Amino acid sequence: MARVKRGVQARARHKKVLKQAKGYYGARSRVYRVAYQAVTKAGQYAYRDRRQRKRQFRQLWIARINAAARQNGLSYSKFINGLKKASIEIDRKILADIAVYDKAAFTFLVEKAQASLAA
């Protein structure tokens, strides 16, 4: 049986990792062992941050909605509760967009929420 040598596969694997590490500083882009660690860690950060991005955007939307609602004399929690009672189903992303770019429409929504809370 012939001896199996893995030089070709090793070279390909090393090239793949070094290609992924392109643009990294110093040994992180040149030395396979260091580059492998850097690429692995980068993958872990990317995986974690794809999930964190969703949380961070929701936090941003809530902060914007809260600021706009308070300018109209209503807290965030009461505003959201009022919208639910008024059967207005607009998600936080769209509400934040309305709060930033269309203040008149947001004021209208706040009035609807206040009316449903009073009723």
Swiss-Prot record:
GO cellular component: ribonucleoprotein complex; ribosome
Gene Ontology terms describing biological process: ribosomal large subunit assembly; translation
Gene3D superfamilies in the record: 6.10.160.10, Ribosomal protein L20
GO MF annotation list: rRNA binding; structural constituent of ribosome
Keywords per UniProt: Ribonucleoprotein, Ribosomal protein, RNA-binding, rRNA-binding
InterPro entries in the record: Ribosomal_bL20, RIBOSOMAL_L20_CS, Ribosomal_protein_bL20_C
NCBIfam families in alphabetical order: rplT_bact (TIGR01032)
Family classification: Belongs to the bacterial ribosomal protein bL20 family.
Function of the protein: Binds directly to 23S ribosomal RNA and is necessary for the in vitro assembly process of the 50S ribosomal subunit. It is not involved in the protein synthesizing functions of that subunit.
Protein name as annotated: Large ribosomal subunit protein bL20
